[in-house]
């Protein structure tokens, strides 16, 4: 595996990610409060994308592949015959943990699924950060993937206005992620409403001008 580089992407807000999460749930028909992430990836995604594969490696084999014990999983998008082969690669202990409901392991798989959706399906580009260059959380591929992962795991609970404790218990998030996603949801809704109001205001102005 190549050295990990610091990357940036286009500006993506909470509103964008919330909309993406809702669309994904609608397309895949995942109406359950608790999202079974391994099943979602293995059954739903592989039917949706014939080029997608989930690769589970033994922990030692995974470490040999990534050369970094701190990396929990990774997503690869490899061009092949003018099409992309999409792979999520995880060690067996993370996969097994996600299967039994471990918060961190569920989040790890959801994070990689978010990368796949954003950069595999939607083909949102990433570029390498130059020396000394910084980017906001809205341009950081890792922060963005974390936000989308939280939305994917909890959007059904968020729309029901669940409390932090309820989100954690019913949707399988850690308490910290539940707190974060509640804030991100409020920001996302506020930005969506602002966009709608802006469009309506512009339409009202243009209608008056035409009259």
Language model segments and positions:
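Active-site hotspot residues in diverse enzymes, especially metal/ion-binding acidic/histidine motifs
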Residues: 1-211
């Amino acid at each position: 595996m190549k050295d990990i580089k610091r990357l940036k992407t286009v500006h993506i807000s909470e509103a964008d990610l919330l909309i993406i999460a809702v669309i994904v749930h609608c397309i895949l028909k995942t109406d359950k409060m608790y999202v079974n992430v391994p099943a979602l990836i293995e059954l739903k995604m592989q039917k949706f994308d014939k080029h997608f594969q989930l690769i589970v490696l033994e922990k030692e084999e995974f470490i040999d592949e990534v050369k970094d014990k701190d990396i929990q999983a990774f997503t690869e998008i490899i061009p092949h015959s003018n099409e992309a082969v999409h792979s999520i690669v995880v060690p067996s202990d993370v996969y097994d943990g996600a299967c039994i409901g471990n918060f961190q392991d569920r989040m790890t798989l959801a994070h990689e699924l978010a990368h796949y959706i954003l950069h595999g399906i939607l083909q949102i580009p990433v570029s390498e950060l130059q020396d000394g260059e910084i980017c906001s959380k809205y341009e950081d591929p890792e922060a963005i993937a974390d936000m989308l992962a939280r939305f994917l795991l909890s959007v059904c609970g968020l729309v029901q206005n669940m409390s932090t404790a309820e989100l954690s218990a019913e949707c399988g998030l850690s308490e910290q992620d539940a707190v974060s996603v509640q804030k991100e949801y409020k920001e996302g809704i506020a930005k969506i409403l602002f966009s709608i109001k802006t469009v309506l205001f512009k339409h009202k102005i243009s209608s008056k001008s035409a009259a």
